[in-house]
């Protein structure tokens, strides 16, 4: 699918980043750092999340992807300052690392191929509704009920880690990136009159607003 068409279809149901002054300041500083180092991710976590991001939001002919847009820096900054309940989905990234290696029968991250990462994304993001319901139920029960002696199944942890990475990637790409706001979405820093009900195709050419 054409990226410009795909961006129109990204709904508000995706997880979004709650911006605070501290987070905005950290976003700005991490984007300008020439010798950037992660504040949240370990080296292995940084590598695996970066690879997933490149597949989820790849570069196209006319639009840069996750790597060029440095989305990993946004996500690392958000994870550093986010509330505890907002980062539950990536608290177990080491399990995601080990599970991805085991699934591909590889001994180290540098041996993983793009196909290995794609297979992992397909397994969890394209899983059937019944499987997703099982993972969600076990995950929710752990956090909502008495957790003594209970553990979340590994596959449920991996599913929520991958889902969180995807949701944060979309949020960083769509809402928190100046290039995308000005060149892909409809960006009007000084809005005109308010019209409560308009045809999106006529108003913006079908593009969503960069600022909501």
What are these language model-derived features?
Residues 1-5, 21-55, 59:
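C-terminal segment of N-terminal export signals and the immediately downstream linker at the start
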Residues 1-17:
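N-terminal secretory signal peptides and thylakoid transit peptides that target proteins
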Residues 18-21, 132:
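Short amphipathic alpha-helical interaction/hinge segments
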Residues 38-41, 60, 64, 109-110, ...:
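Generic alpha-helical structural element
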Residues 41-46, 62-66, 116, 156-160:
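Structural motif
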Residues 45-85:
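Long, hydrophobic N-terminal alpha-helical segment
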Residues 70-212:
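Mature-region segments of soluble proteins
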